[in-house]
């Protein structure tokens, strides 16, 4: 089985680094024309050069700040006035870590805009062209915490659950246009974000960061943290024709971390 995404255009959120950029590289390697989305222009420019060297094709980027949802919507709407895409990967940076008892009301509002509203706005803008083409893939990168909340991630646990519910609802309504919508429940992956969270947790509990990683790895039946490339393979499959009958599901990729069925 060879995944061929030639003549497909993909918009990939949060793709200056981490899981987002791993996905961008994999989709580009499969033949897609990708548009990277991030607020870090220096990294975006660097990545575009790397993708050109990897694929021999031109790719693009969109400079946005997810933390300003109003400006983000304006930029996204402007982009889709002249562009259509086939594949949308909804992904943003994560919200601040913290315990539920210490979260302010304003934090919920900010995280709602960051994780939920940006996802809705991007999807609604993208889906118009997908309907015209009678083909589309929308993939929401969420977290295993929507099924089993993780400690010290109150904001993420709460708002990502709304994203997955919304994604399921969208899948019901968009299926007749041959557009699939799926949610990826992400486990522990070797990224800068995970390093940051573990450093914060180490300070909070006065232990070494290496101990946090060791305990985290022990929680996973495979006894290790995942690599971004492993995540990207799943996204490439879901973006392809091979996934044409997979719709409206929450797919964990976590090394067996979730205990639920």
Question: Predicted regions: what is each one?
Answer:
Residues 139-163, 167-176, 188-189:
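Catalytic loop of short-chain dehydrogenase/reductase
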Residues 128, 172-173, 244:
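Alpha-helical segment proximal to the catalytic Tyr-Lys
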Residues 175, 180, 246-248:
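Short, small/polar-rich loop/turn modules that mediate ligand/substrate recognition or access, typified
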Residues 9, 16-18:
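Conserved glycine-rich cofactor-binding loop
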Residues 99-112, 138, 216:
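Substrate-binding pocket helix/loop in short-chain dehydrogenase/reductase
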Residues 30-46:
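Conserved glycine-rich Rossmann-like NAD(P)H-binding loop of the short-chain dehydrogenase/reductase
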Residues 4, 18, 148, 236, ...:
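Short C-terminal tail/terminal secondary-structure segment
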């Amino acid at each position: 089985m060879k995944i061929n995404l030639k003549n497909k255009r993909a918009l990939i959120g949060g793709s200056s680094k981490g899981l987002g950029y791993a996905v961008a590289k994999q989709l580009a390697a499969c033949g897609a024309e990708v548009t990277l989305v991030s607020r870090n222009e220096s990294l975006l420019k660097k990545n575009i050069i790397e993708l050109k060297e990897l694929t021999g094709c031109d790719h693009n980027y969109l400079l946005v700040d997810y933390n300003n949802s109003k400006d983000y919507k304006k930029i996204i709407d402007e982009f889709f006035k002249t562009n259509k895409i086939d594949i949308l990967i909804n992904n943003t940076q994560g919200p601040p870590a913290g315990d539920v008892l210490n979260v302010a009301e304003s934090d919920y509002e900010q995280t709602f805009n960051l994780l939920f509203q940006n996802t809705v706005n991007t999807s609604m803008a993208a889906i118009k062209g997908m309907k015209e083409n009678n083909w589309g893939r929308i993939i929401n990168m969420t977290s295993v915490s929507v099924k089993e909340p993780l400690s010290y991630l109150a904001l993420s646990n709460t708002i990502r659950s709304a994203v997955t519910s919304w994604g399921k609802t969208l899948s019901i309504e968009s299926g007749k246009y041959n557009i699939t919508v799926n949610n990826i429940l992400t486990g522990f992956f070797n990224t800068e974000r995970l390093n940051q969270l573990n450093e914060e947790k180490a300070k909070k509990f006065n232990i070494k960061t290496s101990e946090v990683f060791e305990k985290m790895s022990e929680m996973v039946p495979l006894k290790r943290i995942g690599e971004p490339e492993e995540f990207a393979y799943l996204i490439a499959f879901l973006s392809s024709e091979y996934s044409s009958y997979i719709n409206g599901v929450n797919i964990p990729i976590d090394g067996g971390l979730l205990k639920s069925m």
